[in-house]
Amino acid sequence: EKSYTFNNLAYGYYLVYQTGTKEIQSSLVSVDKDSKTITLKGKAPSIEKEADKTTVEIGQVVTYTITGTIPDTTGYAQYTYKIHDTLTEGLDFVEDTMGKLPTEKKYEVSVQIEGEQDSVIKEADIDPDNARKITLDLSQWIRENQTHKGNTFTVTYYAKVNADAVVQTNNSAHLEYGNDPDNITTTTPDVVTTPTYPVQIHKLIKDQQNS
């Protein structure tokens, strides 16, 4: 919890406004004595992750959706908002539902604000040491969309199940945010688990088929 002190205020009414949270928090406070304490409770930024399939097979493409809320950055000279995503060895990032592999160290994802008809394409950075890790920096996008503060948004992207998939394929995402570069908050990873079932192939000998 953070606390702030304001000194030498004249008596009267003050609008106290909390920023940096995913929900706008404010309170009209009357100052009518020398000392007064108020408490504002805001929800810290967070993300949730979902997959469009409950079970998958090798070769299938899974659509992942991350949902977040545009935080209020009023009064901040800078604000960091980065989404980190890590796949297991049984998944590979792909560009579409057809399973096209990325060709560059940039990976395109779709970002859409709730209630808006159009989405925008943003580029995530692929970790040079691990092609199954990406970082999506939405810091500038968050600042540019303060007219939508408090609204939810979604990030959509795809991953293909490969031959290294085990019984369960895990995919985790976490958020990195804050207005102080030296004191950035990292959320607990949100893990999506998708059971994987191998494709069973039975070979039939021609003579057995005719018998």
Feature roles, as predicted:
Residues 2-8:
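Short, surface-exposed beta-strand/beta-hairpin micro-motifs centered on an aromatic residue
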Residues 8-31, 66, 79, 140, ...:
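Serine/threonine-enriched low-complexity regions used as flexible
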Residues 22-23, 30-49:
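Extracellular beta-sheet/turn segments enriched in Thr/Pro/Gly and aliphatic residues
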Residues 49, 85, 199-206:
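A short, amphipathic beta-strand motif
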Residues 54-60, 193:
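Short, solvent-exposed loop/linker segments at the N-terminal edge
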Residues 81-135:
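A surface/secretory-pathway sequence property marking extracellular, secreted
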Residues 208-211:
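Short, ordered, surface-exposed loop/turn motifs in non-cytosolic proteins
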